[in-house]
Amino acid sequence: MPVIIEQDARAGALAQFLFNPELSEGSLAYYLLGEGIGLGVIDNGTIYYGEHGTATEIGHVSIDVNGKPCDCGNVGCLERYCSANAIHEQLNANPSIVPGCETMTHAQACAALFAKANAGDETATLLMLDVARYVGYGAVTIINAFNPTHIVLGDIIAQAGQPLLDEVTQVVRERTIPEIGRNTRITLSALPTDATVTGAAAVAITNFLEHPSMFFDVA
């Protein structure tokens, strides 16, 4: 049985491209907002890998040269400010925002924060909007670097919903060249929260169709 390995954000991008007809035209950037921050880019129907397969590591773009240290060896990496891990770290430092967050998973802590924000809790809302602004800074970088037709926000942080999308859109309007920013469509993922699972199926399907000899003896 063939085994195919793919990065989670790229698999998610392929799932968005194959299973959402609205995203099948133009170029697509799947902005994975999970325990880490990732990016998968599809242009002309093809996943972009770069020379050594390490392209589109948006989570390790430094947005603060004097910022928080990252395990990658850099400082100020985007995912230190808007990943589920980073949010949970902030909640653990301020446990009154989400009582009991210390015993929660990263996804549970984020869901609890977003629920409180949606219920009108001011402190939770401020933290959620701060995270959304950092997501927006990443979106600006994606637009400037790749000029995609679509940016799709997915995974744990995207569950913040419309308030997240509104703040990201506002940051993009403020920080991109108007003619470019307004022609980039930013949406929330319409696929299940963990689009990478759907993406794994998409990777298998694509390889089956493109390389049938991997699966069958066609000699």
Task: List PLM regions with ranges.
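ATP-binding/phosphotransfer module of carbohydrate and carboxylate kinases, centering on a glycine-rich
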Residues: 18-21, 25, 66, 74, ...
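Short Cys/His-rich Zn2+-coordinating modules
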Residues: 13, 52-56, 187
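Conserved phosphate-binding catalytic cores of ATP/NTP-utilizing and phosphoryl-transfer enzymes
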Residues: 7-28
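AAA+ ATPase active-site-proximal loops
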Residues: 10-11, 37, 153
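General beta-strand structural signal in soluble alpha/beta enzymes
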Residues: 2-7, 41
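Glycine-rich phosphate-binding loop of actin/hexokinase-like ATP-binding domains
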Residues: 21-82
